[in-house]
From Swiss-Prot:
Native species: Clostridium botulinum (strain Hall / ATCC 3502 / NCTC 13319 / Type A)
Keyword rRNA-binding: no
Pathway connected to this protein: Cofactor biosynthesis; adenosylcobalamin biosynthesis
InterPro entries: Class_I_gatase-like, CobQ/CobB/MinD/ParA_Nub-bd_dom, CobQ_GATase1, CobQ_N, CobQ_synth, GATase_3, P-loop_NTPase
Molecular function in Gene Ontology: ABC-type vitamin B12 transporter activity; catalytic activity
Name used for this protein in its record: Cobyric acid synthase
Keywords in alphabetical order: Cobalamin biosynthesis, Glutamine amidotransferase
Gene behind the chain: cobQ
Pfam families noted in UniProt: CbiA, GATase_3
Domain GATase cobBQ-type: start-end pairs: 246-440
Amino acid sequence: MAKIMIQGTASSVGKSLIVAALCRIFKQDGYSVCPFKSQNMSLNSYITLDGKEMGRAQVLQAYAAGLEPEAYMNPILLKPTSDKKSQIIVNGKVYGNSTAMEYHNLKIKFKDMLKEQFEKLEEDFDIVVMEGAGSPAEINLRDRDIVNMGMAELVDAPVLLVGDIDKGGVFASLAGTMLLLNEGEKERVKGTIINKFRGDVEILKPGLDMLEDIIHIPCLGVVPYTRLQLEDEDGAVEFNKKAYAPIDIAVIKMPHISNFTDLDALKSEEDVSIRFVTSKEEFKEPDLLIIPGSKNTIEDLLYLRQCGLEERIKEYSREGKIIGICGGYQVLGSKIKDPYKVETDLGEIDGLNLLDMETTFEKEKVTTRVSAKLLNEETKNTVYGYEIHMGISKYGENIKPLFKIYDKNGEKVDYFDGAINEKGNVMGTYIHGVFDGVVFREKIINELRVKKGLKKKKSQMYEHMREKELDKLADIVRQSLDMEKIYSIIGMK
């Protein structure tokens, strides 16, 4: 089996999309290929068909490789719960919570498991494309590294180093990274990639030659800055501004926002503009307000209270349309109870009281794939998605369920999910990915269109658009990189 690892000079330099592009290129060239990231830190996660949790970046990479996402592609997932603590997911299941120092001491225990997971891939695939995290030049973490050079050494993988020229200082970041690597690590780096370049490459070439003279490693290509409608896992980036988009959707950007990839399918609607809101001044008068998921619902509820957004949301709810997803759904209720101190020591807290329901946090985490029917007069078509939450919500009298779940991880079930108020303008659900399918997204956006005097439209399947964008990404990267050299590095040609 061939393998190659993509590392970067820093976070958000484009490692994940370079890996996705290589997965698609190798697949197009007839090879069976699999992505692998030993450890990922993200608040955007996904539930596999067998109910396991993994990072969203490896989900996109799996699709690029033509595979169903599986937790073995991302054996360790760290989900920050506060500035100092993270929930640790190992092989798709909750391992526990720990501080950074506690986890640093735990990493040695995971090394054998990671090697074993990787060796299984060697039996099933022609090529494995690995992804590092952050930078390999974090010299304070070198002795227990399991995600960058430590992982590359564990499985004897060659490395390509990616730098982001759009931020500026790409030559310094590449040269500085190489300077901080030890001799064995330097020998693993077989090439560099300049990512997110704007302009004429000819102007850049003298710098590339000088860099090669300094670090003695060839540049394998310059990838242009390109806007793609593919999900971003690393951070809640600003959405592309459209010249004219009559439908204005505001999203509350809470401190612990998670699974904001739920919004990606909405971006595919040509007449929809999405913007983040962090203050009363930014709120304005949107056509729809979305309160997204949260990794610490209680702290984010306190944030809404303290910054004045709670008052503005309640005022907007008199006439405006609101959708809460997972943690955003929980804050819409009358009360949140935390008897086991899952999130804080508060015990319980009043919600926004826009939906007649109460949520209680349990010890066990719900991670499940679901299929549901939308309960309304117009349609009973299926909605697909997944649930990731600690809370159980109970309805009051002045509320109706939004969905009926009929399939859970492949088993037939029969229970309600979500809620909608009597007026029909405030609703919420535990289902992540609820907008990915056409049914719910088309219904909601068409309601907004009609209210503004616009014609209804058919929504496109998000997965079809994603496939086109992945092919576009692969074409750009194939044209930009020396693929013959990359095949030579991995010993395939």
